[in-house]
Amino acid sequence: MPISKIITYFASQNKKQSARATLLRNLQCSSLGLYRKKHKRAMKDKYIDLIEQTFDFPQDEFTVEDNELNFHDIPLMELIKQYGTPLKITYLPKISQQINRAKRMFNVAMAKVDYKGTYNYCYCTKSSHFSFVLEEAMKNDIHLETSSAYDIHIINALYDSGVIDKDRYIICNGFKRPQYVENIAQLINDGFENTIPVIDNKEEIDLYDDAITKKCKIGIRIASEEEPKFEFYTSRLGIRYNDIINFYKTKIQKNKKFKLKMLHFFINTGIKDTAYYWNELSKCLNIYCELKAICPDLDSLNIGGGFPIKNSLDFSYDYEYLTEEIIAQIKNICTRNGIDEPHIFTEFGSFTVGESGATLYSIVNQKQQNDRENWYMIDSSFITTLPDTWGINQRYIMLAINNWDKEYQRVLLGGLTCDSEDFYNSESHINAIFLPKLEPGNPQYIGFFHTGAYQESIGGFGGIQHCLIPAPKHVIIDRDKDDNEYYTRLFAKEQSYLSLIHIS
């Protein structure tokens, strides 16, 4: 057979096979289309299906009953019916749970390596200054960290009300202006013997020498090196590694008023399993060992804060491993240098209070601005109620509160202010937001969860808000010790216009 006929034959066979394949694909697509039309209601396109297929759900703090979301077994729709939206809530039991969780992890880690020092948990007041937060936290035999002059007034108020005694550790961080120094000195002079001002700069020690009349404990903050991708090489806070030993010898060693008890170490990135973190921790420990050799009074290492909080339903962080590794490394380096292990202090703010908070909104309008962008407008502002969402692009767990049995769609969330930055358009696990489709006469509510840290202080609680958007109601939730039933109380009403326009 001529070669040309052979080529023609195989070409015709290929065309037939291609035609068959095309026909088969068309039949499959047609059948799938008919199937989808026939079984549309049975398809897994509901909001609850999306969540269950994307995450391991339900989770400890999130469950769904009758297509409505519960938070720590609290039916959120009941809160909304009682208090309305926008609404901030604080679930107090979570604060104690977090504190005791950290205590347990550090104590277990210490026991595993026969660590001789003690663990001391400090709460950072700047994370949330509210009295109900501080009172709940202090039930757990912990200590406090301050960052400004006004914090000292909080310490005095807690003492006057019997919440704390004078034996609690008060760790005073930050750059000290004259009023802060004066208040710290007054605290020490009044008998708060475990108040430890942490030296941030070399001139600070002279201010205490003038203001404090009693012997006192002090600490030194190390100016740690920043992460390589950060804008700066070295932290602006603290004293340089190379200057610490000489600073101790010239300013502290011969001054009988002061005892250097603590070396303070903090990494802005938080506690992470990275070469950068372990390298900085190792450098800190080497300085501690070198300083301990000439300063017998030194017996405490403050590793600051840095435990993250859950900001997604697929959040993953091995708290136990990191805790055990930190303690093991401290133990090993101290053993190699022949010195006793230090007492460990941590300063947890967000970890303490962050997961206790939630912020609830109503969807008040839907705006289809083009073929792709469908806006759900909330009844408040992200800039005023969750300022970290636009300030540092913080992502939170965001979930529908009701209508979990409805179909979902991709949306953008918009706030009420005129600011172009007042929006929320992505979650930590995906660059998109999905919520139930709206239906006439069926209100939609949404919640942002684990919002309990910093948002009120950064947003300016009680003050003027952007575009004069009022601060929302704030409700406190607790549980009865006898029957574990939850109860609520209104901490703050929605902000009045009188407070917004008040001038004097």
Question: Where are these predicted regions, by residue range?
Answer:
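Charged (often Lys/Glu-rich) extended helix/loop segments that serve as interaction or gating elements
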Residues: E325-I327, K331-S504
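Active-site-proximal beta-alpha core segment in soluble small-molecule metabolic enzymes
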Residues: Y119-S300, I309
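Cationic, low-complexity basic patches in intrinsically disordered or flexible, solvent-exposed regions
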Residues: Q17-S18, C29
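Conserved, mostly hydrophobic/aromatic
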Residues: I95, K126, S148, I220, ...
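N-terminal capping/small domains of soluble enzymes
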Residues: Y35, H39-Q179, N431-S457
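Short glycine/threonine-rich loop-to-helix capping motif typified by GTGT followed
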Residues: K272-N279, K310-L322, V353-N365, G460
